[in-house]
């Protein structure tokens, strides 16, 4: 097994191993993180921040929009074409908590590359 060279960059006290057996689903894992770190900054961009609590609330709301208004369902694909802004993790976690497959695209993709992204 190769060394996990990135672990040397972890701050003191950060557990290097997640016990995946603690969770029944990825959503349960996310919810636990949102709860345990609710007051901490999750993301920062262009001088703005979003806490885990805010991310949880906003992603739940957007998840409802995706499933109730747009009628997306588990296994559907959602293409996200976004720069690194705070809206990206909201959309990402909304889709993941709904079982929607996230497909990231690049604005520089050709038509053929974008069409390939839509294939299942």
Please identify what each model-predicted range represents.
Residues 31, 92, 115:
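Short glycine-/small-residue-rich flexible loop motifs, especially phosphate/cofactor-binding loops
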Residues 1-50, 54-69, 74, 98, ...:
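N-lobe entry segment of adenylate-forming
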Residues 114-120:
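Short, intrinsically disordered, charge-balanced linker/junction segments flanking boundaries
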Residues 48, 65-112:
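Conserved AMP-binding/adenylate-forming
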């Amino acid at each position: 097994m190769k060394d996990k060279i990135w672990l040397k960059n972890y701050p003191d006290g950060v557990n290097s191993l997640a016990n995946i057996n603690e969770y029944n689903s990825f959503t349960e894992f996310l919810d636990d993180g949102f709860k345990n770190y609710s007051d901490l900054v999750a993301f920062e961009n262009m001088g703005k921040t979003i806490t885990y609590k805010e991310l949880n609330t906003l992603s739940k709301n957007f998840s409802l929009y995706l499933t109730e208004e747009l009628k997306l369902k588990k296994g559907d694909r959602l293409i996200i074409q976004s720069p690194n802004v705070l809206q990206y993790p909201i959309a990402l976690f909304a889709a993941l908590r709904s079982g929607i497959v996230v497909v990231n695209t690049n604005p520089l993709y050709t038509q053929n590359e974008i069409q390939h992204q839509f294939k299942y």
